[in-house]
């Protein structure tokens, strides 16, 4: 299994039997460029939270390309998804999509969204973990240690004169580089910070 990051913070998982898009956030054109490879549309899109930087234009993309959207009930309730084929999961939950050849597991994470989670995707050969947002601790990270690859998008470095209230809020829902380095110091797989 391979992956590609993109300019708007999403990830495309490239599986043997098809691709999975993780999160929107870009313009429709940006999402099409990032998620449609050689004319092949993704077999599904996973949206990890309702925040604009993750959910922007997912409805338009999924409707235009007839791509099912996988998310949680609480996240879906926050989005305008009329007409979109939505597959609802709860946190924590694991679901095997036999026909498409992949399984997904959702694990709760500390973040300021309706039902935050990180996910692992297994294609029967490899397992990849993605933490788009949220603060993780060693007790949660253990669920990622069985993954061949882990992609961390929950890294934060506060620069300059951020107001103290903003800095505290961000530090409560994101990890620093140092925290993540410590948490994953004994991880044997491939680790990517995006």
At which residue positions do the language-model features occur?
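Short, acidic/turn-prone active-site loops that include or flank metal/cofactor-
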Residues: 26-27, 74-76, 91-96, 134-136, ...
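Catalytic core of the metallo-beta-lactamase
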Residues: 95-149
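Cap/insert and terminal regions of metallo-dependent hydrolase folds
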Residues: 139-194
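Conserved beta-strand hairpin/beta-sheet module of binuclear metal-dependent hydrolase folds
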Residues: 1-37, 117-133, 149
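Active-site neighborhood of phospho(di)ester-bond hydrolases with catalytic His/Asp-centered motifs
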Residues: 21-25, 42-51, 69-73, 129-134, ...
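Glycine/small-residue-rich loop that forms an oxyanion/phosphate-binding "nest" at active or ligand-binding sites
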Residues: 51, 55-113
């Amino acid at each position: 299994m391979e992956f590609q990051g993109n300019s708007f913070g999403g990830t495309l998982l490239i599986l043997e039997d098809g691709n999975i898009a993780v999160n929107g956030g870009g313009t429709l054109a940006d999402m099409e460029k990032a998620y449609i490879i050689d004319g092949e549309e993704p077999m599904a899109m996973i949206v990890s939270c309702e925040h604009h930087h993750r959910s922007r234009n997912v409805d338009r993309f999924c409707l235009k390309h007839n791509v099912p959207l996988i998310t949680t009930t609480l996240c879906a309730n926050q989005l305008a998804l009329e007409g979109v084929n939505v597959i609802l999961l709860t946190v924590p939950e694991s679901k095997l999509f036999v026909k498409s050849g992949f399984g997904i597991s959702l694990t709760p994470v500390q973040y300021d969204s309706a039902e935050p989670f990180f996910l692992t995707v297994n294609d029967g050969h490899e397992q990849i973990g993605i933490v788009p947002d949220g603060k993780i601790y060693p007790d949660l990270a253990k669920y990622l240690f069985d993954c061949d690859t882990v992609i961390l998008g929950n890294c934060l470095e506060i620069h300059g004169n951020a107001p103290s209230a903003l800095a505290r809020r961000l530090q409560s829902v994101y990890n620093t580089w140092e925290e993540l380095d410590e948490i994953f110091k004994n991880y044997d797989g491939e680790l990517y910070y995006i």
